[in-house]
């Protein structure tokens, strides 16, 4: 099915996504990110929007590349990177979510002793990426079936890395698939790693750490290292859209 065959009414406009983003409880998102490295946002997308995005997967004209995970040791399953120009809803999510996350990212960098600061608007950050040669769009659509999984990893694509990203589940657990939980691990200095499962439903988003975040300890701030992945799909099909704010080399 080609992307042009999807009724436009089933996908929100950039303005609609911006209104949704503005209405979120960003204070809670910030607290959750500081506490656990992730924050869940319920019903960011409607069921119709989820189905429409998932139905784009066979449409090669909206993607720049397809990755079969087993060929690279990434796990099992596959995903496709969207090409520029991004579908309006994907571009809208990037543009609308970034300004709320940039202050958190800047606060984290300051706590970690990094001089890097992120501009207030996503277009300015992307311009910085493109000037450094990171010109390939990174938003992606992932597809899994029974026995597929995604190994724990970090989505780092070049020198310029925005430290927070978003994944949105497009399928409904129990109805469309079983298994396939979103999993994060946090590696802490001189301690065993901590694992967490985020219980997403269709349309829910998880806002989470790309790689490093600061944690306040008894002797000051220390750095923890996070990875994310997806546990084995036991049955059915699972689609997810990933919103990464930096571009790739």
Task: Describe each region flagged by the PLM.
Residues 162, 173, 177-249:
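Catalytic core of Fe(II)/2-oxoglutarate
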Residues 143-146, 158-176:
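Short, conserved beta-strand element in jelly-roll/cupin
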Residues 1-35:
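Fe(II)/2-oxoglutarate
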Residues 84-95, 127, 146-148, 162-163, ...:
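Generic detector of contiguous secondary-structure segments
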